[in-house]
Amino acid sequence: MAEDAPVVQQTMLEPEVLLKKRKVNERTRKERVEQAIAKKEAQKKNRKETFKRAETFINNYRQRERERIRLNRSAKNKGDIFVPDETKLLFVIRIAGVKNMPPKIRKVLRLLRLSRINNAVFVRNNKAVAQMLRIVEPYVMYGIPNLHSVRELIYKRGFGKINGQRIALSDNALIEEALGKYDVISIEDIIHEIYNVGSHFKEVTKFLWPFTLTPVKHSLMEKKVKHFNEGRKAGYCGEEINELIKKQV
């Protein structure tokens, strides 16, 4: 009889073990439900914030454009020429250079992240960048992108660098995870930061993978720059860069 006691005790313990396990499972399930609800609420809040920001950005862009048009008209009426503030944003496209490049040229192109022909990047227009562009001028075209070009490039050709991989900017959650600490939580925030050369321009451009553009015919490039670049096929092209972007996006 004494030998049967452990069996009886084990039988009595089984319901208690199952009950504890059931309670743990219920608690875990409840926590998951609560987490899912909290995540859904956070996503809803972020969507509202994203829409609100986008609306604010668009209103600001429109206001700036109206002011630019007003100043331009006012200058024309007075017989003057309206000269806008020095541009802060440039878009650089690599158009040449494969073999027999001097080491210095190759190094600067690498610093600009233009490792291949038809790679392109946004850069801040400052003294250091201007010096680099002068060095590689025979191998690049660069100019002033407008808001439409910035939007088209980021929406259609934009990829982010996440864990060393090239990831499409198709989910704001990925953007928030990578750039949320800079208060950049959506693709519209990226556009705003780039176009306005904001305080976190460096972090955002570093996050963006260099753009890969569609090749265009050599004659088109020559035509685009000939009249303002003395027949050269490379270099600064001002706002004409937007026509080239339109062909290559």
From Swiss-Prot:
One GO cellular component, as annotated: nucleolus
Localization of this protein: Cytoplasm; Nucleus, Nucleolus
GO biological-process terms attached to the record: assembly of large subunit precursor of preribosome; maturation of LSU-rRNA from tricistronic rRNA transcript (SSU-rRNA, 5.8S rRNA, LSU-rRNA)
InterPro entries: Ribo_uL30_ferredoxin-like_sf, Ribosomal_uL30, Ribosomal_uL30_CS, Ribosomal_uL30_euk, Ribosomal_uL30_euk_arc, Ribosomal_uL30_ferredoxin-like, Ribosomal_uL30_N_euk
Keywords associated with the record: Cytoplasm, Nucleus, Ribonucleoprotein, Ribosomal protein
SUPFAM superfamilies documented for this protein: Ribosomal protein L30p/L7e
A molecular function (GO) term: structural constituent of ribosome
Main location: cytoplasm
The keyword Transmembrane helix belongs to this UniProt entry's keyword annotation: no
PANTHER family: 60S RIBOSOMAL PROTEIN L7, LARGE RIBOSOMAL SUBUNIT PROTEIN UL30A
Additional comment: There are 3 genes for uL30 in S.pombe.
Record family assignment: Belongs to the universal ribosomal protein uL30 family.
Assembly and interaction partners: Component of the small ribosomal subunit (SSU). Mature yeast ribosomes consist of a small (40S) and a large (60S) subunit. The 40S small subunit contains 1 molecule of ribosomal RNA (18S rRNA) and at least 33 different proteins. The large 60S subunit contains 3 rRNA molecules (25S, 5.8S and 5S rRNA) and at least 46 different proteins.
Biological role stated in the UniProt entry: Component of the ribosome, a large ribonucleoprotein complex responsible for the synthesis of proteins in the cell. The small ribosomal subunit (SSU) binds messenger RNAs (mRNAs) and translates the encoded message by selecting cognate aminoacyl-transfer RNA (tRNA) molecules. The large subunit (LSU) contains the ribosomal catalytic site termed the peptidyl transferase center (PTC), which catalyzes the formation of peptide bonds, thereby polymerizing the amino acids delivered by tRNAs into a polypeptide chain.
Protein name: Large ribosomal subunit protein uL30A
Organism per entry: Schizosaccharomyces pombe (strain 972 / ATCC 24843) (Fission yeast)
